[in-house]
Amino acid sequence: MDEVAPGLLVGTMSDAEDESLLRRCGVDAVVSLTYDDPDTGAVARVDAPMTDGPRNEYEAFAAAAETVVERREAGQRVLVHCSAGASRSPAVAAAAMARLTDRGLDEAFEQVLARRSEVDPHDALVRRAATFVTEGSE
């Protein structure tokens, strides 16, 4: 699990199920992008399942990213996770970060990559992120 921006963490399914790790990192909410149900213990979990790759639907992506934005605006420390923490969760985190900070999506992705080496989002998710950021600036 890596903190890619203040209060915004990206991780794996294993991270989401490690209640001790979640507590040590001060995580208030877990946004789960998988179709599995991780046991986050006492930490609040928001299910926002979405597929990886070209079959990903924009509505699912936008709902997940908007959930992260809302939780961060409420001052919560949020872990966004998918299976490996390499494609879906970094893309959603970068989109939320771009929306929260009014910075460009490229800069947000660069920051995520600088803080988490296992980042390789599918091109379709990068496109969904760009649409989310663009729609938020209108």
Feature locations, PLM:
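Cys-dependent protein tyrosine phosphatase-like superfamily
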Residues: M1-R77, A93-E138
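A phosphate-binding catalytic loop at a beta-strand-loop-alpha-helix junction
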Residues: Q76-V92
